[in-house]
Amino acid sequence: MTEDGIKWACEYCTFENWPSAIKCTMCRAPRPSGAIITEEPFKNRTPDVGSMEREIGSPLICPDSSARPRVKSSYSMETSSKWSCQICTYLNWPRAIRCTQCLSQRRTRSPTESPQSSGSGLRSIPGPIDPCEEYNDRNKLNIKGQHWTCSACTYENCAKAKKCVVCDHPTPNNMDAIELANTDEASSIINEQDRARWRGGCSSSNSQRRSPPTSKRDSDMDFQRIELAGAVGSKEEFELDLKKLKQIKNRMRKTDWLFLNACVGVVEGDLSAVEAYKTSGGDIARQLSADEVRLLNRPSAFDVGYTLVHLSIRFQRQDMLAILLTEVAQHAAKCIPAMVCPELTEQIRREIAASVHQRKGDFACYFLTDLVTFTLPADIEDLPPTVQEKLFDEVLDRDVQKELEEESPIINWSLELGTRLDSRLYALWNRTAGDCLLDSVLQATWGIYDKDSVLRKALHDSLRDCSHWFYSRWKEWESWYSQSFGLHFSLREEQWQEDWAFILSLASQPGASLEQTHIFVLAHILRRPIIVYGVKYYKSFRGETLGYTRFQGVYLPLLWEQSFCWKSPIALGYTRGHFSALVAMENDGFDNRGAGANLNTDDDVTVTFLPLVDSERKLLHVHFLSAQELGNEDQQEKLLREWMDCCVTEGGVLVAMQKSSRRRNHPLVTQMVEKWLDGYRQIRPCTALSDGEEDEDDEDE
């Protein structure tokens, strides 16, 4: 007893050292020079007021005689028989079978278990106690504020410690947002338990007449302690819960954290978190597991089996639904030529990178040296119907095809073009991230994705090196477009510069969505026109119109000389924030199709007629025209005829001719398509024959 009374406690690890030790035996910290208030004087003995003052020294918070009324201790005999709760240390009456504060079950004391010394010694003090001693728990709270409790092992560390000295767990301030949500809850339980112990260490009179909380924060913390203590049930269960959460976090990978952040982003309306998960290649149809729901710790928002789509519907995130629903629909098995032949695809990418050059002169824009147009092979029609259906399911985007054909007559609305002139357009499937525009442009030309961002780099470099040229066109076009809708306003030059800087930044960020200006620049890089067939309005998940899309129209390389460009355009489709390549199927190339069209081509050339009017026979808009080039429809039609090979069909439809040749096509692209098609040709023997005559025909062949 005497030796324990003269030991000194380390201010870092609270270990009790012998008085002759100048350093802590456990953590090697130097012995403090001043007095430190600890709980040790209250343990294992019955102190008097004089000894407490000698050992503790001056308290950190000591109210004067006017702060608290001087009262004598009462009910000492009754309080001495109270039992202390094992969870919150609250002193309950002997007849209580549950804790009044946290409702935890009273634990039966074993014969070998000794009573708690932290409270019994103080409860046996018979005489009156000074108010400074009575409210000394405030001093202890001050000391506790200088420490932080480890959420993994519940060890109390010094405030200066960056990590737990026992388990090396980092401080809560260094953890991620999702980890903080869990550790805050754990630390709140521990802090409330500590505060309850400090209250139990006070005098019997203070225990008997506890004053109500002095602030709203204290009452909120008490209410939270009651709820959490009732949920945990016991300290052992709480420690097991912390251990389980730590195991779950250790198993988490980067993709898992991105998925959880995306779920939180849907709930909080943060689209960037969802886009970050999409860009990383995450599965949009992924469901929340029980461990992930436990880690998120928000039962009101998350449930097992929920996907990002479920959360978007529940919290009415219409903008996210428009993107996510397209994503989920595309998780069917896809098999495009670029996926079947990775070696050839890499060679094609190297060919594209080698064909990118920069024009010398004032307009130093980048351009491609090769003219390549991708078309579906005509050999597809030789496959059995079941194999054809499988092929189209794996190479086409059925949702985009349906939206452009059935929901709105945007493509293939002319029976003359689709049937008699063999100019039916097919929407190819591609990635649905922010690179879909660049992917669709390369698919319409070379049949592959812009996986290495070769086209994006050329786009950004062209915008940077030719910024003055494109900026003047963009500014003039935006001003005219706003005035055409009756929006008469003027912007300061600083505002125009800020908007232009944002357009430049989008071009340099892989995965960032692109705008009309980028399509205009891509037309200059390809040196050929780009025709976009797209929906006219943005719509919500419920079908409500939100605004104009402004993407549909013709984009001409107006800043090049006409002699430097090709007149064969490519076609793209736009639906709900997504671009798709629109390609045709090879045809025989004969027959003078189209009134007034003198093709004069051999049988190897495929001619696709792309309409320059919509289903209402209105001329498509030509984007980024200057004030001198703007005019009525006749003047714009004349401009289109100058930049493209145009003709009028017998049905009176103004069309542009897209010409492609298998012999003139790049050999690597032809080889890639043939290898892809061979995979479907091998499926043919597995199909059932309809009758015996077909079997005989196959044998004759």
Swiss-Prot record:
Residues 425-585 form the OTU domain. The gene is zranb1-b. One of its GO terms (cellular component) is nucleus. This is Ubiquitin thioesterase zranb1-B. Ubiquitin thioesterase, which specifically hydrolyzes 'Lys-29'-linked and 'Lys-33'-linked diubiquitin. Also cleaves 'Lys-63'-linked chains, but with 40-fold less efficiency compared to 'Lys-29'-linked ones. Positive regulator of the Wnt signaling pathway that deubiquitinates apc protein, a negative regulator of Wnt-mediated transcription. Acts as a regulator of autophagy by mediating deubiquitination of pik3c3/vps34, thereby promoting autophagosome maturation. Plays a role in the regulation of cell morphology and cytoskeletal organization. ANK repeats lie at residues 253-283, 306-333. Keywords: ANK repeat, Cytoplasm, Hydrolase, Metal-binding, Nucleus, Protease, Repeat, Thiol protease, Ubl conjugation pathway, Wnt signaling pathway, Zinc, Zinc-finger. Residues 108-121, 202-214 have a biased composition (Polar residues).
